[in-house]
């Protein structure tokens, strides 16, 4: 059977289809749009994607995403941020969701995921030891566990609480209030919902 589409277009469709949430038909539309669009658009897109790995890195303290030219996250180095309070999140994009509420003025710690045995992710693969070190070094007074309202997020929250207590650390541990529906990732929650969740956080 003869090839229906040029190989370059087929390759673009296949690669775009690797993106999460992008099905075959959507990948076809995106690829065809880029083909019809001004050549400079495709070049700018390709350049931006190429710069992702060279221009972005993880903060060695908070594990938030920062420019490759930065030493640490500005959300940590900023003297106006309260280092005595840490919001623990699963992924870097969760920070954006909480920052948009304008209600949190502490610092963040990105775990890099959540405990999920079915996906082969255990606590040893998360940035938990670094969190413990930060708690001791910065003399942190409160940890807000802001993991997602999912089975994995809850499992991670419970593990963190037990790990901190077992380590003999005396600290206030809170969890975001249940304004966030079960099964909804933090980055998709509305600003109002997150504001209520922060205000109504409870002892954990």
Regions found by a protein language model. Give the residues of each.
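Conserved nucleotide-binding/hydrolysis micro-motifs of P-loop NTPases
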Residues: 67, 80, 92-95, 114-117, ...
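Cys/His-rich short segments
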Residues: 48-95
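Conserved phosphate-handling catalytic cores of large alpha/beta enzymes
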Residues: 168-178, 182-204
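Basic, flexible Lys/Arg- and Gly-enriched helix-loop patches that mediate nucleic-acid binding at interfaces
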Residues: 62, 71-78, 104-106, 110-133
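Acidic beta-strand-to-loop metal/phosphate-binding motif
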Residues: 85-90, 140-152
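Short Gly/Thr/Asp-enriched flexible loops that form oxyanion-binding sites at enzyme active sites
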Residues: 152-167
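Extended, structured, electrostatic nucleic-acid-contact surfaces
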Residues: 1-20
């Amino acid at each position: 059977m003869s090839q229906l589409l040029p190989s370059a277009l087929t390759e673009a469709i296949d690669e775009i289809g690797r993106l999460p949430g992008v099905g075959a038909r959507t990948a076809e539309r995106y690829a065809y749009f880029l083909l019809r669009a001004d050549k400079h658009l495709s070049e700018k897109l390709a350049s931006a994607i190429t710069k992702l790995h060279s221009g972005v890195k993880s903060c060695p303290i908070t594990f938030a995403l920062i420019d490759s030219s930065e030493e640490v996250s500005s959300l940590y180095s900023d003297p106006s941020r309260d280092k005595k309070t840490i919001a623990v999140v699963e992924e870097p994009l969760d920070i954006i969701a909480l920052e948009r509420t304008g209600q949190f003025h502490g610092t963040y710690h990105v775990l890099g995921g959540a405990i999920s045995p079915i996906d082969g992710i255990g606590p040893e693969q998360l940035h938990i030891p670094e969190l413990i070190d930060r708690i001791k070094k910065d003399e942190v007074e409160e940890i807000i566990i802001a993991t997602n309202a999912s089975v994995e997020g809850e499992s991670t929250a419970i593990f963190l609480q037990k790990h901190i207590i077992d380590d003999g650390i005396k600290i206030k541990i809170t969890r975001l209030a249940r304004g966030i529906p079960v099964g909804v990732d933090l980055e998709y929650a509305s600003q109002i919902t997150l504001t209520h969740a922060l205000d109504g956080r409870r002892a954990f």
